[in-house]
Amino acid sequence: MRIVSLCPSNTELLAYLGRLDDVVAVDDSSDWPPEVKRLPKVGPDLRIDMDQVEALKPDLVVASLSVPGMERNVEELKRRGLPHLVLAPHSLDDIANDLLQLGEALGETKKAAELVRRYHDVLDWHRERAASAEPARLYWEWWPRPIFTPGGANWLSELSELAGGRNIFSDVPQASVQTEWDDVLARNPSHILLVWVGVQTKKMSPKAVTARPHAQQAEAVRTGNIHILEESLYCRPSPRLLVGLKKLAPLLHPALFPPADDSDPLLCG
């Protein structure tokens, strides 16, 4: 089978299902597992080279609608008559359903079901632990200028709760929210989590926040709780969010959650 993946989260789903050997090309940003870096690239996820995709004669193109603008890819796949599957995850349950849907399409239903069972076990364990925590007020920053942050309709609001926190923009019923720094200050986060999409952690600094007007009004700034996180563990709707959750929870509540490590709970044991 010849598979093309058009975004990083889809590539990661294929890896969990053990089908990377069938992948003949990926988008430019797919970088996990590391072996996908050797695969041919078909362009950025919002500007896929469909001529190249078609030339690869795929048996299945795994597309997504997780980011605005991706619908152009889907329309072009339909126009060219290329066999495709479209995933549109916005919640943690959506991600589990995507695993099942992709597993069915690939004849991997048993493996997908086992992955989903373990996935829900991890979520349930964190949910039980987090229930006794005083929720930390979390401000997630996807992009600094203009400011974009996840709203209540995004998986990071759910992930926040499972780590013993609360997304301060969870009251906004959108997946992505454009806002102003003054609004962030008014909500007074106790932790600021920088996950700038597509930006490496080594290129980021807390100074990007502390230099902003009236930054000291935020509890997170006064207490030094500005955290630079790996965006690939938080901004992609794949089971790798569980690795991000394992890192975030002890950061917020070290007495409740075990120290973080890099192990993936779906790939252990």
What are these regions (language model features)?
Residues 1-269:
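N-terminal ligand-binding lobe of clamshell/alpha-beta domains
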